[in-house]
Amino acid sequence: MSATAYADTSLLASLYLADANTPAALAAVSAAGAPLLLTSWQQFELENAFQLRLFRRESTRADLASAEAHLIQDISAGMVAIVALPVASVLPIARQLTARHTALVGTRAFDIFHVAAALQLKATRFLTLDTRQRALARAAGLRTT
């Protein structure tokens, strides 16, 4: 797998459960033109995002089942690739990003973690709908859409 894209979990949630950001998420994934990397951390965060949508009554159980089926279909089709993320090796990268950029960009810890994970996994693109996270990804040398 040569070209790969790492998507922030909020973008993934909008990709699989329709909301106001779904068109932008679809456009970002289409523009990336590469398989999306998916770590166990992102899977956990996505599961939680789905459950929060249920709690907030923004989605139904049927919506969640459909979203999960769509994700499984994308994994089977090779559009999403499950990858291992060695967290212990991501934290030093995240700490470096924090020291260099947080005071300038104003990024939150989990946003930094995702950028660090993308760097560790050698993703060729970083997909996010968050402007601060996008600025951090660019400052870290990642291509964004």
Residue ranges and their predicted role:
Residues T22, A34-P35, A77-A81, L104, ...:
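A general structural signal for well-ordered secondary-structure junctions
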Residues M1-S66, T131, A140-R143:
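Short, well-structured N-terminal submotif of metal-dependent ribonuclease cores
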Residues T39, L85-V87, T145:
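Conserved beta-strand termini and adjacent loop/short-helix elements that scaffold enzyme active sites
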Residues V80-A135:
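Active-site neighborhoods of divalent-metal-dependent phosphate/nucleic-acid chemistry enzymes
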Residues Q43-T98:
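Active-site-proximal, substrate-binding regions of enzyme catalytic domains
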